Amino acid sequence: MKKFRLFLLGLLFLSLFALPNVTTAQSLQFTLPVAEVEAYIEEDGTLSLYYILVFQNSPNGAPIDFLDIGMPTSAYNLKNIEADIDGQPITDVEDSPYVSNGFALGLGDKTIQPGQSGQVNIWVTGVQNVFKGVVNVFPFY
């Protein structure tokens, strides 16, 4: 059963990155040469997520000053989110105004300028209700 849950979780996260690699929104033009998500099911049933995202901003793109990150459920606490860009802490973490079940990271003076790149690492702990509605079926031998 644990393997099945991990398979479903892995499938969910793979689908997040099945979209085209080049993204354009308003005047933003960037690629994600690296987009990795590690998911850990904790002993208490919560989920911990570790994101590794490398943004390559186009020379013609606008500065990337905010990042909106989607979550698998709304049952998480903003205080359980730690993030950094190129090793420098990101302290502006708030609910996303654009992504339901998501949060926004304000990069402030760490904004990714046109033609530049930045690696963003995000650690989210205590995500709850990930398996809500999953039917547990045990074989009767």
Feature-to-residue mapping (PLM):
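Bacterial N-terminal signal peptides
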Residues: 9-18
